[in-house]
């Protein structure tokens, strides 16, 4: 009999590596991509959504029937909503009113409560509102994806180790987009632990407020 998972969260991680044959046919090496959209909510953020909740449960900060709060307009919100639905937590997500209707519909489908903030206040307005909600509600935690140590740690333990194992340690360069920095930092540190000569590159939009060539 094949493996039967106890819940949807057990399917997070273990995503495949696929060779880009057309892209690398004229290159001296192989270009591989890790298909994080194979995660149940279709993004790499599923890893940190579960990891953040796991850590909060383990520390006793998040108790049964509690509420998870975060300011997010992206995939982290979807991941937290998924985990909340699977574990029985309330999820409250704050975001500027300028965010797409499609994103709001998806989040509500997972059972999340959406609190919209003035678009003129940007993401800072959403962050301020999230802090306010956590203060007002009992048994509530702030996910803090940008500052939560569980974010890079889950990539050290899973993403980086998966890449190393699936390539039999044949990794020269690791490239990742940078949002919170958790993926490139955590996975990059693991790869460099196995082989200090691995080069790690973080990629972000040119217009980003951050300007850095390396984080590892």
Stretches with model-predicted labels:
Residues 1-216:
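PLP-dependent amino-acid enzyme catalytic core
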């Amino acid at each position: 009999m094949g493996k039967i998972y106890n819940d949807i969260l057990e399917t997070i991680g273990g995503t495949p590596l696929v060779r880009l044959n057309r892209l690398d046919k004229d290159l001296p090496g192989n270009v591989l991509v890790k298909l994080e959209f194979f995660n149940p909510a279709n993004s790499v953020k599923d890893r940190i959504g579960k990891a953040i909740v796991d850590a909060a449960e383990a520390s006793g900060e998040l108790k049964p029937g509690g509420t998870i709060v975060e300011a997010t307009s992206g995939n982290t919100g979807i991941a937290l909503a998924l985990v909340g639905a699977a574990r029985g937590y309330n999820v409250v997500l704050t975001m500027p009113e300028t965010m797409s209707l499609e994103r709001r519909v998806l989040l509500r489908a997972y059972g999340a409560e959406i609190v919209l903030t003035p678009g003129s206040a940007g993401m800072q307005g959403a962050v301020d509102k999230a802090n306010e909600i956590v203060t007002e509600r009992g048994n509530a935690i702030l996910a803090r994806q940008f500052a939560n140590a569980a974010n890079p740690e889950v990539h050290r333990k899973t993403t980086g180790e998966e890449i190393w194992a699936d390539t039999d340690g044949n990794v020269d360069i690791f490239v990742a987009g940078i949002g919170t920095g958790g993926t490139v930092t955590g996975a990059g540190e693991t790869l460099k632990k196995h082989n200090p000569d691995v080069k790690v590159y973080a990629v972000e939009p040119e217009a980003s407020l951050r300007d850095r060539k390396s984080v590892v």
